């Protein structure tokens, strides 16, 4: 776990720099109107989604560490260029759009590689603990990044945020250069073949696997109907119920707290022996709590429902992520991670808009009940019609480390 701890520390610092820059870009873009702010977000997300499968194939072909080093160096250069351009020409719209497109392209190659790296650094039984530590680090960054970004952009502008981000990417590249990773065995190296065939082979492999297929379907359901609850539906519910903004924030905070409690528990005590069953149970609990949130008569009940929803969310995410990563064939680690990011990103893009529109046209409570019902159907079908409940954590030994 020592090597993993070194990498996770550097990755957390790098992610903090990215969060600071992300807030700075969003703030500057919002100053030019909501339509332009949405265009900047699209410029990041569209190339990321379109190129994810290619990014996974490249990582499986040439190695996740090598891809990450190249991406970190590229982002260091890009951030330095953004800082210099912002100081020279100001915070121009074309500059924001160009930077957003470049970030989206690099992300498409970086995310599958970084997602597969824990499997190369940590043995099977400790994988759930390792991913829980990463989840906690991500929540810490999500909590501290935007306020820090606000301070930076208000006091020094987007150029300072870009310079700080460049420094964190450079740090990440240095850490990766000194990190020893295991050399895959011959049987774990991807076979030769056409590039695009290899890229889409991750989808075929996931669809054919009796554990990966239901795990990814359940992940897509969670992305579509659980992730929008905190960021979209809770604020809408609070406004429609005429609760103060602090109440809506407290409910969202209770959900985050519940998720963190489970992550800490798994980090300290380890994961369940049957992660598939634990993940299904967690999503069932979260769905029930979302239903309770929909009919909550006041803020205290909503707070309790939010906390339980967070506990269920944490139980699901703390077990589904290591199960997917541990079940992936050694030849397809990054490609399966690319598919995992896709099944989280695409449904969320669709349902955020659909659910928001439904809540505007009717009631946030009704939309929350729809989400709860969809989660209930997804978990029940998965529990009854798939092999996921019986799935156990993978326990594959690590190969020897390379110098």
Q: What kind of region is each of these model predictions?
A:
Residues 1-403:
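Alpha-helical transmembrane-bundle signature of multi-pass membrane transport and export proteins
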């Amino acid at each position: 776990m020592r090597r993993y701890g070194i990498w996770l520390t550097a990755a957390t610092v790098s992610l903090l720099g990215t969060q600071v820059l992300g807030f700075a870009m969003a703030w500057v873009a919002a100053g030019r109107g909501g339509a332009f702010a949405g265009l900047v977000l699209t410029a990041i997300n569209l190339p990321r989604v379109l190129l994810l499968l290619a990014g996974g194939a490249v990582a499986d072909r040439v190695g996740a560490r090598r891809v990450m080093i190249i991406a970190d160096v590229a982002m260091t250069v890009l951030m330095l260029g953004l800082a210099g351009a912002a100081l020279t020409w100001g915070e121009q719209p074309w500059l924001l759009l160009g930077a957003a497109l470049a970030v989206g392209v690099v992300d498409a190659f970086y995310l599958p590689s970084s997602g597969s790296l824990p499997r190369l650094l940590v043995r099977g039984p400790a994988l759930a603990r390792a991913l829980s530590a990463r989840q906690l680090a991500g929540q810490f960054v999500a909590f501290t990044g935007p306020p820090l970004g606000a301070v930076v952009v208000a006091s020094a502008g987007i150029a300072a945020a870009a310079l700080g981000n460049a420094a964190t990417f450079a740090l990440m590249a240095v850490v990766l250069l000194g990190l020893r990773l295991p050399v895959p065995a011959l049987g774990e190296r991807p076979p030769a073949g056409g590039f695009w065939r290899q890229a889409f082979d991750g989808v075929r492999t996931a669809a054919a696997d009796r554990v990966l297929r239901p795990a990814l379907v359940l992940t897509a359901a969670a992305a579509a109907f659980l992730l929008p609850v905190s960021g979209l539906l809770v604020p809408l519910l609070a406004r429609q119920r005429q609760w103060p903004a602090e109440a809506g924030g407290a409910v969202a905070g209770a959900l985050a707290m519940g998720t963190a409690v489970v992550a800490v528990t798994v980090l300290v005590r380890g994961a369940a022996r049957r992660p598939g069953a634990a993940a299904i149970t967690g999503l069932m609990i979260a769905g029930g709590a979302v239903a309770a949130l929909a009919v909550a008569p006041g803020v205290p009940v909503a707070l309790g429902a939010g906390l339980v929803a967070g506990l269920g969310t944490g139980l699901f995410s703390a077990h589904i992520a290591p199960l997917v990563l541990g079940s992936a064939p050694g030849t397809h680690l990054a490609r399966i991670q690319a598919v995992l990011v896709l099944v989280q990103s695409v449904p969320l893009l669709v349902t955020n808009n659909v659910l928001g529109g439904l809540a505007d046209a009717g009631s946030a409570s009704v939309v929350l009940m729809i989400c709860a019902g969809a989660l209930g159907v997804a978990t029940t079908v998965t529990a009854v019609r798939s092999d996921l409940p019986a799935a156990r954590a993978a326990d594959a030994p690590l190969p020897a480390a390379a110098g």
